[in-house]
């Protein structure tokens, strides 16, 4: 929502974005996106044509689909039409609380100059004003349901402040140039509203409704210092945002591992690959693009199976325990006993699965990585590990459950839950490709000092026991198998620029089937659920599926 993205995790990247004139010393060849990657871009274009050009909804949809570049995936086209029709369901006043509001072109920009430096603050969204201009409204978007999550206070305060005090300005062309605000005319702004629209269900929520004085006070208390600090930057923190960073070639904190994926082709546009992305692509290219690149929302009536909820709940409990400081080993008393339903965060574990999950957690005690906490030098819960394969121009991202360091080196820890007791038809790396990615990343030394003696621990929890395993990334056979698996998953994904749907069995568990024109419905409604033992946890619990803008 704010012009300065407050949600990104890398201070250096945020600062670089806050300075449009900053550019890399060495520019690589231009690589155009084959498909639209900003899901709300077509939506904004269609609304612009309806509100400012007088097009009908259908005319606007057809014009944008025909002329916007890069083109949208068919699934994004479905989502765009759904969101547009919901947004414009009441054309005269779709979201406002009382009086009619009228669309405003351009942006509301607060601009100042100090020590020769131009400072600009603005917020992204759709802008509206009352007939006399005394009331302004900024409408922002959430992919899912409006009001379902709280936005950062600094973000909301910035939106309210720029809506209250910003001057109209067109988008700079080129972007490195400053805005050229025009002093507003007419009555002074007296009232400001920030309204959130939910694209999935056409819901709306008023996030702020107050005077300009209240907006100024909120900005001074909760945003001014935050924005100043973000613009100053800080130490780089490589993560999932690296692919879009304009100073990536100058970043010393990002590990570079040419050949990590076994692909010698850097001609494609830079993208990000994780084990979950690779698995989603192998299931269906369209599913991967719609869910993990565009982050389109899941239907409201989609549901997780009890097994999936159980697995997520077990992981959430262990994550909280392993984050405690000082480090202490897990004890039976830390866990629910399973005699009744229980919950952790968003996960409600009920019935038989409440007892199954409790038994799994109880068996974790015997294999807890902090049994000898005094020997642990460092630990990080669910860190984001990233490396740049420059030979393929791909950011490889992983998120282990836990990494910790002892006297031997770094340990990459993964926990799995299952009730499966049947025969094994796959190796551990084949069954869990994220372990294959872990092998290659550890062999490349991406964790820094302590990587030489690194190992991977896998903890499989069942109701009747824990099954620990250990993998040595330095073992030649293990490394060869990991490379075969990773390259086999990465090659087709890397080569594919169209993400054509592959309807079939994958439709049954597809989280974005609502948007896919090629979706094949299951035989019964109960068939369309998310099962745990066959679906990666990272794919299930992807918070970006309800992203806010």
Regions found by a protein language model. Name each.
Residues 1-8, 238-313, 319, 548-549:
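C-terminal, charged and often intrinsically disordered regions of DNA end-processing helicases
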Residues 97-171, 382-446:
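Non-catalytic protein-protein interaction segments used by genome-maintenance enzymes to assemble
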Residues 10-20, 52-59, 127-138, 185-201, ...:
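Short, compositionally biased low-complexity segments
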